[in-house]
């Protein structure tokens, strides 16, 4: 009886120790690395900001992201440095980050979270998926809910707007645009614009000046500072006298939660009294 009681006591102590050890492992902050500016913004919006130990070049929002060590840029990924930092989760941009080093990192047992949203709903879904890893899952879910609500408000506000033919201009020499299967085109559509290259089979086609002129856009959407407007107007004059709208570059280009700011900016300019 004493042996049973003693064994039970030891067993209970062991269970408590293991439980405590397991809890401490679970409570240890997850080490996260982001490999693109958009996934960095997603991480902060999902409550994972304090877990980030490194990020990519141009990860500059929110401002504290600028303090993170940079382990990736447009040239590639610093594989050796990432392994040295011992991350447990890597946030990757599918199609933007090279696949081979990501597969090598996965072979080390590192979890890879892929993000490549082409719709506003997919951004919200990415936030919800990140809730699984976040120490603040309610923040991730709240960010997703707020994003959906703000886009729903825009859709309701501009639902009866007569679509205006618009050219989404990315670059000048050469001219690039986007098809209807991208995040940027969806934002344009929500605001009451009609992408003149929506039917392109290529997501990001290079187009000619003549291809644009024949479609007669009333609106040209660009990104950058206000000083770009005059340059674009001069580029198209005298053959095309379309209204030029400029948007905050990071808001519009990054597939992250701040795309709503670009949408609100575009909707306002596209539907003001001067349009």
Swiss-Prot record:
Residues 1-27 form the signal peptide. Residues 31-275 form the Fe/B12 periplasmic-binding domain. Pfam families: Peripla_BP_2 (PF01497). Cyanocob(III)alamin binds at residue 58. GO terms for biological process: cobalamin transport. The record marks 80, 210 as: Important for BtuC binding. Disulfide bonds join 191-267. Gene3D superfamilies: Nitrogenase molybdenum iron protein domain. Transmembrane segments: none annotated. Keywords: Disulfide bond, Periplasm, Signal, Transport. One of its GO terms (cellular component) is periplasmic space. SUPFAM superfamilies: Helical backbone' metal receptor. GO terms for molecular function: cobalamin binding. The keyword Disulfide bond applies. It is found in: Periplasm. InterPro entries: ABC_transptr_periplasmic_BD, ABC_transptr_vit_B12-bd, Vit_B12_bind_prot, Vitamin_B12-ABC_binding. Part of the ABC transporter complex BtuCDF involved in vitamin B12 import. Binds vitamin B12 and delivers it to the periplasmic surface of BtuC. The complex is composed of two ATP-binding proteins (BtuD), two transmembrane proteins (BtuC) and a solute-binding protein (BtuF). Belongs to the BtuF family. This is Vitamin B12-binding protein. It comes from Photorhabdus laumondii subsp. laumondii (strain DSM 15139 / CIP 105565 / TT01).
